[in-house]
Amino acid sequence: SGSKTATKGDGCFGVRIDRIGSTSGMGCGGVPKPTPGGS
């Protein structure tokens, strides 16, 4: 489901973080901490 987000890299690191993003809290799909603007 978050493939499209990981593909664009919308301010995120990539698909590698997409799966551990929930646990790490560094993913945009869950909690956009590193990107508050979403840019």
From Swiss-Prot:
InterPro entries per the UniProt record, alphabetical: Natr_peptide, Natr_peptide_CS, Natriuretic_peptide_brain
Principal subcellular localisation of the protein: secreted
Disulfide-bonded cysteines: 12-28
Role summary: Snake venom natriuretic peptide that targets both NPR1 and NPR2. Exhibits hypotensive and vasodepressor activities.
Similarity annotation: Belongs to the natriuretic peptide family.
Annotated region (Disordered), positions in chain: 20-39
Protein's name in the database: Natriuretic peptide CnNP-b
Cellular localisation: Secreted
Record has Secreted as a keyword: yes
Pfam families: ANP (PF00212)
Organism for this UniProt entry: Cryptophis nigrescens (Eastern small-eyed snake)
Keyword field contains Magnesium: no
Entry's Gene Ontology molecular function annotations: hormone activity; toxin activity
Keywords annotated in UniProt: Disulfide bond, Hypotensive agent, Secreted, Toxin, Vasoactive, Vasodilator
Tissue occurrence: Expressed by the venom gland.
